[in-house]
UniProtKB/Swiss-Prot annotation:
Biological role stated in the UniProt entry: Catalyzes the last two sequential reactions in the de novo biosynthetic pathway for UDP-N-acetylglucosamine (UDP-GlcNAc). The C-terminal domain catalyzes the transfer of acetyl group from acetyl coenzyme A to glucosamine-1-phosphate (GlcN-1-P) to produce N-acetylglucosamine-1-phosphate (GlcNAc-1-P), which is converted into UDP-GlcNAc by the transfer of uridine 5-monophosphate (from uridine 5-triphosphate), a reaction catalyzed by the N-terminal domain.
Gene: glmU
Name of the protein this chain belongs to: Bifunctional protein GlmU
Keyword Transferase among UniProt keywords: yes
Ranges for region Pyrophosphorylase: 1-226
Region (Linker): 227-247
Quaternary structure (record): Homotrimer.
InterPro entries noted in UniProt: Bifunctional_GlmU, GlmU-like, GlmU_C_LbH, Hexapep, MobA-like_NTP_Trfase, Nucleotide-diphossugar_trans, Trimer_LpxA-like_sf
Amino acid sequence: MVAVAILAAGRGTRMKSNLPKVLHPLGGRSLVERVLESCQLINPEKRLIIIGYQAEAVKQTLEPYEGIEFVEQKEQLGTGHAIIQLIPYLQNFQGDLLVLNGDVPLLRSESLHHLIEIHKTNQNSATILTAHLPHPKGYGRVFCDGNNLVTQIVEERDCTDAQRQNKRVNGGIYCFNWPQLAEVLPKLKPDNDQQEYYLTDVVKYLNSVMAVDVEDYLEISGINDRKQLATAYDILQNRIKDYWMRAGVTLIDPDSITIDDTVELQPDVIIEPQTHLRGQTVIGSGCRIGPGSLIENSKIGENVTVLYAVITDSEVESGCRIGPYAHLRGEAKIKASCRIGNFVEIKKSTVGEKSNVAHLSYLGDATLGDKVNVGAGTITANYDGVKKHPTVIGNNTKTGANSVLVAPVTIGNDVTIAAGSVINKDVPDDSLAIARERQKNISGWRMKTDD
């Protein structure tokens, strides 16, 4: 049995933020969410989140995750003090405790699984995840004997000059035999410059503590300030983009592209420069996305082209062409083989198959049938200042340039709306609707001048 404890009580003053450090976002999810999800494959018996600074905000963020227990650390007196708070929650627990830091978001599940396996196989009192860093500044140093058993862990601020030459560092990830750890926790003393209870001090009280090196030292990267947050984002992006390129996705100028790890891409997708894919986005095979596009929480069908467009919370079916400079939002649904063109905004509307909205239009709260042609400058006037109203347009209908459809209004099938019309009444099938003043020409007229 394994229980997981995540240390998430600190403020993180170097972030210079009112937001708790563990709630800062990294690629669409908070740091602590990423840590929590890294241990999902372990299937722990218990998941304990140690909270302190802005505890309610942390609770609210993690509310969607089931089976979590929150442990409050009212005073932040070090990592050892944090683990002492677990004693009432694990009184009858006889398994192992995996301790994770809420600000170390790049850990892979495989690394944690390997750590636990080594711990169990060797029947260690504790097993520590370590790494050899080229530049170990800021990390505690781990000292081992010839059998990889830990003899000492020294925080950097307490290291001598000679000890600082050791490049094997403590990753802050531990697997403990809980009954043995619980027995020695009361022995911890705050006898250091920080007057804190260091969890690493338990090493001298436990029988066998082994160090295990992580395969990629970047996994243990901690986040203490905005620069480190940006560095972690780069590492995460490189992982994601490497995965998708190996899976058959073409990234043109990968450095200018960002992809959340919640995004799903099919083979033969081409992502052009300056494109950003976020949230629960799914993109079908054969699509060409970008350049200069943002797609968030949206589903894109096969063989869709998106050029300089913003698409959020929407769905685009196969064979569509979107952009340039189109904006789809608020549950817009574009059915197959449509063209949504220059400077078009579509919000909370459905556009039927093989329809065109090519230029300078706004469609809000509208339902369009199949093979509708929306002329340049057509607007649905859906808001009366109090509430929004629907517009319905039937199959094979055409709206002329600069038309205004004042909702609520229903336009039938096979209707033509004359250019420049303001339509505020329903139009039956097979009709021509004209709603504008008749043109009047005044012969011999001249504009007055000063001459």
